[in-house]
């Protein structure tokens, strides 16, 4: 059963080939057996899962239907889950049990999904390798000496290892799409405001967005259907009708205009990845797409702008973790200042402390205009570049990452080298656009992804193109040895 996609599970549950409880028990056993090799879970919620599975079976027996009813899910460990540890991969929240469900968790539970656990992640979602977690690094199932990408590395590794068919992730600068590329998955970052952020512990509030990780575009469509929608509890949620994401998966690509930004194919891109991207372009041309070169002239400014804006927002968001109301508290503080200083110094890891310091500096009185205001101006230029490009093309295509997965620890001492791995993904977050990564081949036995970007609220078109591509290629069907 572990080889089934989410769509296959939906069909199997509907025709009563197996029950949700049988499926849940099989996957829980598989997690217990295999997860110690990859460390993709922080918490496994066995009792919760079995209770939800029995409830889903009862709902189905009573005549209820639904693609997600009784299907398994695991949540990135920054989605609050009622009564379950929600740690953000940090010592700071190691003892925090959320008193409520995040909107995403609640919506998927209402749809009947079964929560198998909470997945490992870079601490407070800050990282590109899933090495900064308090609970240890996650390993890439394709090569256990390599990283799975981040920050949703646990969510990606769990699906790649066939521990379950789909997981939730979040994407602030590429944290769904980059691990999807490095583990041979399909990962979708929706339009900013498409999926509620209520109960999703914040890193950078103007950039964070939740989305699905799965093996196929068809599965991402099913999961996004359950996640998307307006939420009055989230002030950044957008009141836009949610289409049927599965309805147009098979639509023709005849005449679809795809733009290849010339800036995506310059220095820094592994030439073998460039070849795989061009091969995927040829497949889409065979399906009827028309491809042309375009320009995104301000792309080179994206990383510096992002690494001012995101840490600035993080320094503000993470100021709430002070050892007073919840989270880690240091032993025997001498006074209030000592409580704050030691609780934060001991509770946060090195990368989180680095970004808090950078953000605080960028927001300080003497530097606010020089850094934060300037970064927001660059953000506007990047958005304008995309708007101009989408006057000429329907979608933008390029590599998801400049390199395949690197070895564990290879970039730990050089944070900027790791930051540069997000060079192709950050732009979509700065502009708030939807983006999808899909499997496109292998380099040295390690997966490579191709990224598609679309105008606002065109997730359906991204899923359509990825699905048609996956009907004529088999990269997404390949599984790592031993899993």
Curated annotation (Swiss-Prot):
InterPro entries: Amidase, Amidase_CS, Amidase_dom, AS_sf, GatA. GO terms for cellular component: glutamyl-tRNA(Gln) amidotransferase complex. Belongs to the amidase family. GatA subfamily. Coiled coil: none annotated. The keyword Zinc does not apply. This is Glutamyl-tRNA(Gln) amidotransferase subunit A. The active site is at 76 (charge relay system), 151 (charge relay system), 175 (acyl-ester intermediate). GO terms for biological process: translation. It comes from Pseudomonas putida (strain GB-1). Disulfide bonds: none annotated. Allows the formation of correctly charged Gln-tRNA(Gln) through the transamidation of misacylated Glu-tRNA(Gln) in organisms which lack glutaminyl-tRNA synthetase. The reaction takes place in the presence of glutamine and ATP through an activated gamma-phospho-Glu-tRNA(Gln).
């Amino acid at each position: 059963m572990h080889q089934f996609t989410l769509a296959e599970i939906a069909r199997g549950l509907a025709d009563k080939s197996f029950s949700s409880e049988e499926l849940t028990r099989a996957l829980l056993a598989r997690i217990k057996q295999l997860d110690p090799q990859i460390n993709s879970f922080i918490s496994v919620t066995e009792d919760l899962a079995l209770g939800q599975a029995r409830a889903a079976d009862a709902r189905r027996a009573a005549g209820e239907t639904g693609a997600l009813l009784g299907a398994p899910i695991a949540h990135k460990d920054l989605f609050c889950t009622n009564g379950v540890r929600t740690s953000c991969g940090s010592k700071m929240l190691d003892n925090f049990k959320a008193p409520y469900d995040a909107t995403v968790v609640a919506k998927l539970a209402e749809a009947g999904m079964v929560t198998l656990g909470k997945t490992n992640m870079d601490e407070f979602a800050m990282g590109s390798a899933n090495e900064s977690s308090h609970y240890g690094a996650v390993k890439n199932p394709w090569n256990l000496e390599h990283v799975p990408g981040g920050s949703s590395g646990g969510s990606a590794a769990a699906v790649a290892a066939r521990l379950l068919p789909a997981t939730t992730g979040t994407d602030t600068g590429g944290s769904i799409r980059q691990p999807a590329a490095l583990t041979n998955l399909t990962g979708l970052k929706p339009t900013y405001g498409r999926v509620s952020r209520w109960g999703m512990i914040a890193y950078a509030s103007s950039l964070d967005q939740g989305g699905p990780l799965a093996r196929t575009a068809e599965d991402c469509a099913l999961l996004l259907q359950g996640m998307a929608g307006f939420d009055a509890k989230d002030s950044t949620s957008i009141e836009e009708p949610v289409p049927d994401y599965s309805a147009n998966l098979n639509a023709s690509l005849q005449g679809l205009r795809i733009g290849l930004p010339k800036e995506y194919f310059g220095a820094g891109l592994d030439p073998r990845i460039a070849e795989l991207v061009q091969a995927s372009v040829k497949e889409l041309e065979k399906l009827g797409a028309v491809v042309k070169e375009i320009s995104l002239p301000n792309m080179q400014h994206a990383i510096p702008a992002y690494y001012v804006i995101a840490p600035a927002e993080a320094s503000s968001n993470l100021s709430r973790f002070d050892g007073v109301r919840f989270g880690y508290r240091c032993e025997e503080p001498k006074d209030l200042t000592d409580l704050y200083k030691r609780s934060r110094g001991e509770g946060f890891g090195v990368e989180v402390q680095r970004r808090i310091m950078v953000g605080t500096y960028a927001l300080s009185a003497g530097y606010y205009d020089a850094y934060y205001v300037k970064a927001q101006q660059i953000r506007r230029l990047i958005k304008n570049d995309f708007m101009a490009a989408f006057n000429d093309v329907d979608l933008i295509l390029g590599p998801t990452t400049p390199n395949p997965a690197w070895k564990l620890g290879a970039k730990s001492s050089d944070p900027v080298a790791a930051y540069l791995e997000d060079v192709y993904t950050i732009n979509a977050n700065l502009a708030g656009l939807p983006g999808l990564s899909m499997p496109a081949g292998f380099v040295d036995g390690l997966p490579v992804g191709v990224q598609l970007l679309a105008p606002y609220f065109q997730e359906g078109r991204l899923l359509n193109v990825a699905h048609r591509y996956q009907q004529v290629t088999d990269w997404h069907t390949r599984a790592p040895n031993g899993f």
